[in-house]
Design a protein with these regions (language model features):
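Glycine-rich flexible loop motifs, especially short His-Gly-Gly/GGXG/HXGH segments used as catalytic or interaction
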Residues: 46, 50, 104-143, 167-170, ...
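A solvent-exposed beta-alpha-beta segment
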Residues: 1, 7-106
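A short, structured surface patch at a secondary-structure boundary
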Residues: 202-265, 305-309, 313
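A hydrophobic, helix-centered structural microdomain
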Residues: 129-192, 229, 299, 304-320
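Generic recognition of well-ordered alpha-helical segments
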Residues: 16, 49, 53-56, 80-83, ...
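Short, glycine-rich, amphipathic interfacial segments at transmembrane boundaries or analogous
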Residues: 36-40, 96-101, 105-115, 169-208, ...
């Protein structure tokens, strides 16, 4: 059993979580809060008194531990409350109020005695993990280039014969650490001024798309030149899909946590794509899947995504 000490809103949030998860085994016996009258109840749990009365209230109640929960604006009181709790001799915990700031599972580390809370856990920040993934990208891209070279040569010939212009279309995208790079694709549209293409997505029955281009976009064959982006180190086999700078600037203001996707290399395929979020689909849902991938990366997850891509990721129903 425990006693919650702190501010009303944080205490209510903690009570709601404990009551919603009985498997945790916690039983809250009471609340100490300076801003709520003694005897007030919240979901059957009473306010026992003020925080200053902790040493008086504790002997009257059998408690295994005390949990301190304060709003960010009240952290100046933390030292005082910890001192009172320590005098009680009861095991004390601190529940930081950072849910609005840190929306996902954080992790802590010790830097020469200085405790540091990392806002987001990114496995690929680990040097060993990053090297393993890069080795997998190099090997995979080389194999991919060799295996698909007959198909790529065929596409080059068809594009050249059916539409005037370059074979490869190079477009600026935003990648790792917000750095821009030129992403390669087989040209699937009529040649147009760069100023016209920067700020518009392709739409259904877009007249700019060539006949062979429509087929390539639908089957994702137009993405094959990105194997060279992977070999160069601009991209990875698996990761969040990169976007154009104009849209990145737009989405960073509209979608919370959008920019987190740039903490890893963008991918040829990704967790969002194999779950159906490709092309003209919800950006917010794509970001949810991208964040899951970033925070839960493993070699096994990459292999799973590559496997799923072969079975359901190539055909893009939302490609125009």
């Amino acid at each position: 059993s425990e006693c919650l000490v702190g501010s009303e809103m944080c205490i209510r949030d903690s009570i709601d979580r404990v009551l919603a998860n009985p498997q945790w085994g916690y039983v809250i016996r009471g609340i100490l809060d300076d801003n709520v009258p003694a005897g007030t109840e919240y979901k059957g749990i009473k306010v026992l008194g003020r925080i200053a009365n902790l040493n008086i209230i504790l002997p009257e109640n059998r408690l295994d531990e005390i949990a301190i929960t304060l709003g960010l604006s009240e952290y100046y009181r933390l030292e005082e409350i910890v001192a009172l709790c320590e005098k009680s001799g009861v095991h004390t915990k601190f529940i930081p109020d950072y849910n609005k700031i840190i929306p996902t599972k954080p992790y802590t580390e010790d830097i020469l005695g200085l405790p540091v809370i990392n806002i987001r856990y990114v496995p690929l920040n680990n040097t060993f993990n990053a090297l393993v993934k890069r080795a997998m990208d190099i090997a995979g891209s080389i194999v991919g280039i060799i295996v698909t070279s007959p198909l790529m040569l065929l596409m080059c010939a068809i594009i050249k014969l059916t539409s005037p212009g370059p074979l490869i279309y190079k477009q600026e995208r935003v990648g790792l650490h917000n750095q821009t790079f030129r992403m390669y694709k087989f040209r699937s549209m009529e040649v147009q001024p760069e100023s016209e293409e920067k700020k518009a997505w392709t739409v259904k029955n877009d007249p700019r798309v060539t006949p062979i281009g429509k087929f390539m976009r639908h089957t994702s064959i137009d993405e094959l030149p990105q194997l060279f982006n992977i070999l160069k180190g601009n991209m990875s086999l698996v990761g969040p899909r990169p976007e154009r700078p104009f849209f990145v600037e737009k989405f960073r203001e509209e979608i919370p946590r959008y920019m987190v996707k740039h903490q890893v290399r963008p991918g040829l395929t990704g967790w969002a794509q194999v779950n159906g979020y490709r092309g003209d689909t919800s950006i917010r849902k794509r970001i949810e899947y991208d964040l899951y991938y970033i925070e839960n990366w493993s070699i096994g997850l990459d292999i799973k995504i590559i496997f799923l891509t072969f079975f359901k990721g190539f055909i893009n129903k939302n490609a125009y």
